Amino acid sequence: MWAPSGQGPAGWDRRRVGARLRAALAGLQELQGLRATQQARVRGALGLHPAPGPRGQELRLEAALTALREQLSRLRRQDAGLKTHLDQLDQQISELQLDVSRSSCEALDSDSRPSSGFYELSDAGSCSLSTSCASVCSDRLSPSLGSWLPVFQPSKSRSGIGDWRPRSADETTVPAWSPQLTEDSRLLHGAEGTGRLTGMFRPRPVSTGDLERVLPADVGLQRAGTDAAHLLGQGIEIPAHALDPTYQRDLVARGGQEVYPYPSPLHAVALQSPLFALPKEAPCFDICSPPQEPPLVPVDENRTQPEPIRELGSAEAYIHRLLHLRGQELPLRDVGQEQGGDTAAFPPKPCGQRSESTCQLEKQACGADRGGLKLGRGAAKDSLKQHGPVSLVGAEPLSSPLKEETIPWNPCVHGDNTVGSSPCSQAQQPLNDCGQGPVLSPSRVLGTESPPLAPEPFAYTSCTTGETSPVKLRMGFSQNKAVKVRRRVSEKVPRLGKQLPPQPERQRVTERDPSRPHQGGLSRRPTLAREPPGRSCSESTLYPVPFLVPVVVAQRESYPTSPQAFFPMEAALLSSAARRKQRRWQSTMEISAKAGSVSQPGPSMGLPRSPAKRGSGPRAQSRPTLARQDACARCESDPSEHSADCTSLYHSTIAETSEDEEASDHTANRFGDESSSNDSEGCFRGSRRRLAIGSAEAGQGGWAWPRVPPQQPSRAPGNTRPPLPPVPKLCRIKASKALKKKIRRFQPAALKVMTMV
């Protein structure tokens, strides 16, 4: 059945075009056979019932015409009095002996309408009714005379039906003279077929009364009905061609869900569609590869088809080669067995109608791809165990909520034993490795190309399992965390005045980090929150584009990760205008900071000991306190492109401001609590101390912080200052020392309005 052709794409094209042409011919023959069978069915149905429909319609039309005739005759009988009056007027006209022939000829030459005489001027400009009557009356035969033939001659109603139509009022006023009536009847009998009178008068235009003149009365509708039945039953007699037995079987779709039965229009269209083509044995193939299309297979088709698979050996070898290049090997036989036609070992579909072709091989290739993906996931988990700190640095700032002392952090990342899911058990090994090496080292491994890592499923699948027991997980190590925060504050604050180089701070962060996963506290403060994930501090100074690290104030029920955590570049671009404003403010602050540091360098050194004797009570947790802490912490955590010494000068300026505020007692009364002045003394230190106290209280008596809606993430700085704890952001103060004093004399609402500018 296949035409001999060479190998290669040209031979494939010739074979495909030939198969499509043969399929189209078979589809057309099938459609012709279907039409012949349908015509035979219609003839049989019409022979059983002798067409009552058209005859009934004809009877209805005849009844309607009869009713119209009766109505017209009744109207004419009602107008009998008018007719006699008009007859009398016509007699008066004849007595006046007018020139009837001349006026009638002029009227007919000018206008064929019978009412034109009303407006015709004759006899020295006198218009009269006699003139109008004379215009339609003549000694010869007028077409108006035929309108009264059914009234006076009811036996000839059928012969004069051509002229029996509605007339105008003046047309019915002509008297019926007896010699003209006989002449009229004779002429009508001579011209009854055409309905036109033999004379010099032109016929009237067709009106509603000319229905029966146009349509033949007896034969018209009956002929139409018989012609319709004849044309329906006649048809084109097409001999039933011998169809190719290859196409005389049901077609099954590739998925086995659609079945096209053989003698059906859908089957014929599917055969001649360009989406299908037929190889030697299989009736129908979908397009699956360029050389050949995969199958809509017949039900009774044999499953071993060596020729199509032998054709597609090169394509399958190409697919195998591609898959081998990608490192995902197919669990199939060698190419020689696939080309040899030994395809019966593949398990058939449950429908039992599939034949082996490229689609099955591709399905198995897809299954192998899925298996390769599973293996790839396992290998990724193994590689994650080898490079544990890499996944920790990438995924920990994203999956764990960063609000301190309020929300349990992710047990997956920290390897908590209370949650017994398998992803968490897989995540415990990287954390044990993390305790043995520095945490900042994987940022060099990741480099600038690696985004924040969150593709692995265990990075946040078991966060929902950790939601069930947040209080139990919180209360475990809150006291240890509070002591640790106090120690860090005492270590960190004296360095601000000394303006140490950034490298010792970097080393201190590196030394403190490895012990944190083993303490297991839920209120763990992320040490890398100030840095972009996957980048080191040296890289952030090399690349001028600042990244945003999301410090999310998450809610207690769920742990949503902000989209800016996954796309820090977009978030950095969004907040570029705000950063420009901050740079403008910080240039002013830098000037004031330099002046304050030259005049009073001392208070920043003596600052950590002043809040030790006060401000340690639980009163420090009120809401205005949060506003004040936030103001100081926002001043401290603003992104800056300056060096670390400018930053320490800026902190000394804040310390001066808070020390000068200690003398003003009315500020605390304005804010409504006694601890606001204590907070303003040591802004960054007091805020951290309060965080430690809040963690101790929360470990004993439940949740201590009020619920704050999620705010915008803070910007990651480009300098190497040690990271600060994220606190709820309420307002922001960026002003000099004198301006801060003036601003704080206002109410808190006015403070918010003025500082948001």
From Swiss-Prot:
Motif PDZ-binding, chain ranges: 754-757
Basic and acidic residues: compositionally biased ranges: 505-516, 631-644, 664-673
Region described as Disordered: 486-540, 584-684, 696-728
Compositional bias of kind Polar residues: 645-656
Membrane spanning stretches: none
GO biological processes: epithelial cell morphogenesis; hematopoietic progenitor cell differentiation; inner medullary collecting duct development; negative regulation of cell adhesion; negative regulation of nodal signaling pathway; skin development
InterPro entries tied to this protein: Dapper
Coiled-coil ranges from the UniProt annotation: 55-107
Keywords tagged on the record: Coiled coil, Developmental protein, Phosphoprotein
Inhibition of Nodal signaling: annotated span: 1-281
Molecular function GO terms recorded: beta-catenin binding; delta-catenin binding; protein kinase A binding; protein kinase C binding; transcription factor binding
A cellular component annotation (GO) from this entry: mitochondrion
Tissue: Expressed in kidney (inner medullary collecting duct). Expressed in epidermal keratinocytes and hair follicles.
PANTHER family, sorted: DAPPER HOMOLOG 2, DAPPER-RELATED
General function of this protein: Involved in regulation of intracellular signaling pathways during development. Negatively regulates the Nodal signaling pathway, possibly by promoting the lysosomal degradation of Nodal receptors, such as TGFBR1. May be involved in control of the morphogenetic behavior of kidney ureteric bud cells by keeping cells epithelial and restraining their mesenchymal character. May play an inhibitory role in the re-epithelialization of skin wounds by attenuating TGF-beta signaling.
Subunit structure, interactors included: Can form homodimers and heterodimers with DACT1 or DACT3. Interacts with CSNK1D, PKA catalytic subunit, PKC-type kinase, CSNK2B, DVL1, DVL2, DVL3, VANGL1, VANGL2, TGFBR1, CTNNB1, CTNND2, CTNND1, LEF1, TCF7, TCF7L1 and HDAC1.
Family per similarity comment: Belongs to the dapper family.
Note on domains (UniProt): The C-terminal PDZ-binding motif may mediate interaction with the PDZ domains of DSH (Dishevelled) family proteins.
Additional facts recorded: Involved in non-canonical Wnt signaling only when massively overexpressed.
Protein name listed in UniProt: Dapper homolog 2
Species classification: Eukaryota, Metazoa, Chordata, Craniata, Vertebrata
Originating gene: Dact2
